[in-house]
Amino acid sequence: MRSATTERGGSGRPPSPPRSAPRRSRGAPRSAWPALGVTLIWAFLALFLVYPLLRIFYDAFSDDAGRLTLQNFVEFAGDAFYVRSLVNSLVLGLATVATTSILGFAIALLLVRYDFVARNFFSYLTLIPIISPPLVGVLGFTFILGRAGTVNVLLQDWFDVAKPLNFVYGMHGVLLVETLHLFPMITLNVVDALGKIDPALEEAAESVGARGWHKLRTITLPLTTPGYLAGALLVFIWTFSDFATPLVLGVHDLLAAQAYLNIVQFVDRRLFRMGLVISALMVLLAIAFLIAARRYVAIKDYS
């Protein structure tokens, strides 16, 4: 009896086996990888960001028995030294924003509006302070302007100065170091904002007689406000939370320095808890300034 294949085609070949469905690659389906990546990111943030913050706030708002209380903050407000540290931190942050704004705006305008020799090289030089570790900068200042620094040694040798002059030790030194370290944050944001300004707006202002300082004040500066505020907020928060620079320069009455000193002493439980209270207060203030800056930008019209 002939096969069906032989009858139809006469080839005598056996029928080809049916094609099997393509095999799936081993492991998770391709559509599951984005979900897995998002899960890992959230797990990382929860473990290393959310949990530490929650633990700080829990310890700051609780007593030794674990009961929620505001007594720790009452003690903070009743201590004149901590209140002075809070005021000093706010004043230093605002002063640093002011000085970095002047220097950062000037350099940004120079880089964007003027063409000069080695402009690109100069723009790279302005990035060095921000990419170098903060401790390197403050140590460099002490080597140059400290009591035994280069400047004081030259003053003693050349001008017979009896006592070394205090150039950097104190709040003025912290302001100087923070300004020269953080002004690139203003410069970078303002340069980006200046590059996005429509030249037609400034040309229209010039056509009606607005030139020089008047054009800068009424057209250019308002249009750079969103970018400037982003840089100013970074400068303020960085200065507000920096403890290494003040400690090296002998300034202890700042919130960040007190938080560090109280937490690392590991002896007095009350001081340790006060360090956590200061840390929680700094986080709350930083969030408040961030919300205020975002709302200020939101209610302004920059179109």
What role is predicted for each listed range?
Residues 1-41, 293-303:
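Transmembrane alpha-helical segments of polytopic membrane transport and secretion proteins
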Residues 208-210, 222:
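Glycine/proline-centered hinge or cleavage motifs at structural transition points of membrane proteins
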Residues 30-64, 74, 78-195, 223-243, ...:
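Membrane-water interface segments at the C-terminal ends of transmembrane alpha-helices
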Residues 117, 210-211:
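Short coil/turn motifs that cap or connect alpha-helices
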Residues 66-69, 191-203, 212, 225, ...:
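Transmembrane helix boundary and interhelical loop/hinge segments in multi-pass membrane proteins
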Residues 12-18, 61-71, 147-160, 250-258, ...:
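Peri-membrane helix termini and adjoining interfacial loops of integral membrane proteins
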Residues 6, 18-22, 199, 214, ...:
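Feature of multi-pass inner-membrane transport and sensor proteins
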